[in-house]
């Protein structure tokens, strides 16, 4: 009943003209959404504390003056109000549309940011059929310590954190996951920004930085935009040595279904984005995109006994599918308030089979579904923004069988001949449910003595439920057969059986954060002190994160900035779920543990920067030092004679980042052309240990055949893969002819790193080899022609050419056999064609 009392002030503001059947249904859906989540979590103690803290301060009223009622301004985005002192790089929808790229994921457009490195620094030229987004690292932090936000709501998928602990058991848990819950096509976004240092106290849950996306909202003008985009392997160059050429024609996936080699593929994208005014105060945006990829592979169907047991193969494609849906409503019941309601959906699917499996297909899914309700109201002294959201993230696997039989055939000397499997590993799913409520009050600037103040206060509550479900027992049988010289099988074969139990594992997690900051202006100084306080019921730590940044303007075009900040990262509460799954699996190789002894991971930051406008140039020099502490890592150690894995707080490591950025402020005019240029350079130095997972630093290892400790090995090779990257951007437009030409050039430092060698040497000591590959330069280009046909109607054609010069470099070596291996190279030249229609 109390819930409906809260709704009365909002419902009373609805104009009579708005009341019709269609709009009544929208209101009912919103009320059901709020009521369902309110009753689900109303007994949570942290939620009650949160509501009692923030229910009372806002009692003032003021009307916002607008010049055009039909243009609906977007809601406040947290971190926007005082972010003038934050280090922020923003990509608008216009910049997104003209940037040369491949799959159109959010992270594909961040390559020009000097604070971002990719988890796999060099892309794999043999895997260009994939369409998943890449993981990124911000300022040298772990990729899973990058926070992702969409419309004020955190969308990090914590289910991705635990995959490494399930090594060796991957078939009985979902096979794919990703840190990003939603795989949005970037054309659905109005902007993407990265906050990398001096980040507002309103943002948390990271040690690296934050990627903030704002979905398309109604702009005040009705429109429809259609887009089709495609490429295929015949439009691309692939560097392949003689050793790998012989296996490309009969390429097969690996033992867990990964298509390591993809010589033939076909990728397509379709996108529609529509904006529609429903009445004078209500607008709607609908977006849908589908990305598909078909990757040629060869499937095992049997063995030819008359041809020395040669594998018989049949061409069957792996499939990739990514569907994304967006529906946003923007309502201004009166000029001083605004309500947004948004629905979002993402479904990524892989249809595949395993290398040695004869008759079982597997479907792996990465899904996300969510809704957001936001209310913004203006008072006499400021603006109050409230956001309520619910999301469900799901990773699941569907298999045609829950029983598998694995057969290994040996010759009469007990040497392996071939092996195969029939059946499958059953269905399973991992689920994460998030309930999010956040509130922020931004005061209008006011003067206190000779200083101007702009104060923001707010808080965030999030309740998360995790669960794992396996509906059936999974039965496996391993058969060892010996083929005698006369062609018959030795009887009886040796067999072992095992059962992985069905069941459900549940756990939950709550987190609350409150924050405050004040942007102070005095003479030529700007200061922004702030604080963020967090508490969760998982690690049960009280985390206090001070934030401070100061800026001094000795002259109008010159600025010096100093920042001292602490960022608390994600604590990965889903590890508790992983612990329960291991118990369900009766897994004795992992240490079942109580996580209460773990400390919250965090990073301390010192930042210095200098910026100077010189005529039409803007120059920025920056330095960031990060001390990363208490990161949660996987450790392997012997316990009672068995080598077991567990989670611990890892050793701290420092990161130093030096950046140089130069760009022109206004476009240069040359004839009928307009030019914009940018130059960026970053040098990253880190002592991070990133070989597999961080184990005991005194653990003995072999590097290039020499016995040493792991810490000694780290001192001999570069831990950051690449020391530096230089980035150049040159864009040209010819408005009279509706032509845009965009160019991005990346020069990367030589790779100096190491890789672990496969094989069991019987002594339990890991073996590594170092490698050194030269610099790599890549030029990506895009040209777009968009003539107007009539009125608002226009068509466009865009051609993207990635790696125009077809320059590649080797980035690793893969073993084929004890006597043969092949090099893996970066992608060669690649063409993309895009056409569209807008009206």
Swiss-Prot record:
It is found in: Cell outer membrane. The keyword Iron does not apply. GO terms for biological process: siderophore transmembrane transport. Residues 221-839 form the TBDR beta-barrel domain. GO terms for cellular component: cell outer membrane. Pfam families: Plug. GO terms for molecular function: siderophore uptake transmembrane transporter activity. Gene3D superfamilies: TonB-dependent receptor, beta-barrel domain (2.40.170.20), TonB-dependent receptor, plug domain (2.170.130.10). Residues 80-216 form the TBDR plug domain. Its main location: membrane. It is a multi-pass membrane protein. Keywords: Cell outer membrane, Membrane, Transmembrane, Transmembrane beta strand, Transport. InterPro entries: Plug_dom (IPR012910), Plug_dom_sf (IPR037066), TonB-dep_rcpt-like (IPR039426), TonB_rcpt_b-brl_sf (IPR036942). Belongs to the TonB-dependent receptor family. This is Uncharacterized protein HI_1369. It comes from Haemophilus influenzae (strain ATCC 51907 / DSM 11121 / KW20 / Rd).
């Amino acid at each position: 009943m109390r819930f409906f009392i809260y709704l009365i002030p909002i419902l009373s503001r609805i104009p009579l003209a708005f009341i019709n059947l269609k709009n009544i249904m929208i209101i009912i859906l919103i009320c059901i959404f709020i009521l369902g989540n309110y009753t689900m979590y109303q007994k949570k103690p942290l939620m009650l504390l949160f509501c009692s803290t923030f229910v009372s301060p806002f009692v003032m009223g003021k009307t916002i003056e607008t010049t055009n009622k039909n243009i609906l301004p977007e809601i406040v985005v947290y971190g926007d109000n005082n972010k003038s002192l934050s280090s922020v790089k923003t990509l608008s929808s216009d910049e997104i549309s003209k940037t040369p790229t491949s799959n159109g994921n959010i992270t594909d457009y961040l390559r020009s940011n000097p604070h971002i490195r990719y988890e796999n620094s060099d892309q794999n030229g043999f895997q260009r059929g994939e369409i998943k987004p890449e993981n990124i690292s911000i300022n040298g932090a772990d990729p899973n310590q990058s926070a992702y936000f969409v419309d004020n709501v955190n969308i990090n998928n914590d289910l991705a954190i635990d995959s490494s602990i399930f090594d060796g058991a991957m078939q009985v848990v979902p096979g794919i996951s990703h840190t990003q819950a939603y795989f949005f096509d970037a054309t659905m976004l109005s902007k993407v920004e990265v906050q990398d240092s001096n980040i507002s106290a309103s943002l948390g849950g990271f040690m690296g930085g934050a990627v903030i996306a704002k979905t398309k909202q109604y702009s005040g003008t009705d429109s429809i935009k259609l887009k089709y985009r495609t490429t295929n392997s015949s439009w691309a160059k692939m560097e392949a040595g003689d050793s790998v050429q012989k296996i490309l024609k009969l390429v097969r996936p690996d033992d867990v279904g990964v298509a390591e080699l993809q010589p033939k593929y076909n990728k397509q994208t379709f996108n529609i984005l529509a904006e529609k005014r429903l009445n004078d105060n209500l607008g709607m945006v609908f977006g849908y995109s589908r990305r598909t990829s078909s990757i040629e592979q060869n499937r095992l169907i049997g063995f030819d006994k008359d041809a020395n047991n040669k594998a018989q193969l049949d061409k069957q494609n792996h499939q990739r599918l990514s569907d994304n849906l967006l529906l946003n409503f923007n309502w201004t019941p009166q000029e001083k308030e605004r309500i947004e309601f948004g629905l979002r959906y993402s479904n990524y699917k892989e249809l595949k089979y395993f290398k040695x499996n004869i008759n079982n297909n597997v479907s792996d899914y990465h899904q996300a579904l969510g809704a957001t309700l936001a209310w913004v109201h203006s008072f006499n002294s400021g603006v109050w923004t409230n956001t309520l959201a619910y999301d469900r993230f799901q990773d699941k696997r569907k298999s045609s069988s829950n029983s598998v039989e694995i057969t290994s055939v040996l010759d009469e000397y007990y040497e392996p001949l071939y092996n195969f499997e029939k059946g499958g590993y059953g269905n399973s799913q991992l689920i994460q449910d998030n309930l999010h409520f956040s509130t922020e009050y931004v005061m209008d600037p006011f003067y206190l003595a000779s200083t101007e103040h702009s104060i923001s206060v707010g808080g965030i509550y999030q309740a998360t439920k995790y669960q794992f479900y396996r509906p059936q027992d999974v039965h496996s049988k391993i058969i060892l057969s010996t083929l005698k010289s006369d062609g018959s099988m030795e009887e009886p074969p040796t067999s072992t059986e095992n059962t992985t139990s069905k069941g459900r594992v549940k756990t939950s997690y709550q987190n609350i954060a409150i924050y405050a900051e004040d942007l102070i202006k005095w003479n030529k100084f700007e200061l922004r002190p702030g604080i963020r306080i967090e508490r969760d019921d998982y690690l049960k730590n009280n985390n206090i994160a001070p934030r401070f940044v100061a800026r001094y303007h000795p002259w109008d075009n010159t600025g010096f900035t100093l920042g001292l900040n602490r960022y608390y990262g994600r604590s990965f509460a889903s590890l508790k779920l992983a612990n329960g799954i291991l118990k369900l699996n009766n897994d004795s190789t992992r240490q079942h543990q109580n996580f209460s002894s773990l400390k919250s991971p965090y990073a301390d930051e010192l930042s210095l920067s200098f910026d100077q406008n010189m005529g039409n140039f803007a120059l920025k020099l920056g330095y960031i030092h990060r001390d990363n502490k208490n990161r949660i890592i996987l450790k392997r150690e012997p316990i009672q004679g068995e080598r077991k894995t567990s989670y611990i707080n890892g050793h701290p490591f420092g990161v130093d980042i030096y950046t140089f950025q130069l760009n022109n402020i206004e476009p240069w005019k040359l004839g009928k052309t307009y030019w914009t240029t940018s130059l960026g350079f970053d040098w990253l130095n880190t002592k991070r240990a990133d070989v597999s997972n961080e184990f005991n630093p005194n653990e003995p290892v072999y590097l290039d055949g020499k016995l040493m400790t792991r810490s000694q090995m780290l001192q001999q090779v570069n831990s950051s893969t690449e020391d530096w990257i230089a980035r150049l951007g040159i864009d040209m437009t010819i408005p009279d002819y509706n032509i845009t030409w965009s160019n991005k050039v990346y020069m990367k430092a030589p790779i100096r790193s190491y890789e672990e060698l496969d094989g069991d040497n019987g002594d339990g000591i890991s073996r590594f080899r170092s490698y050194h590959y030269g610099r790599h330069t890549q030029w990506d280009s895009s040209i777009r022609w968009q003539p107007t046909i009539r009125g608002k109607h226009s068509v466009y054609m865009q051609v993207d050419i990635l790696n125009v010069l077809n320059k590649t470099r080797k980035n690793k070596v893969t073993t084929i056999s004890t006597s043969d291996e092949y090099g893996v190279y970066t992608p060669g030249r690649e063409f993309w064609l895009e056409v569209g229609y807008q009206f």
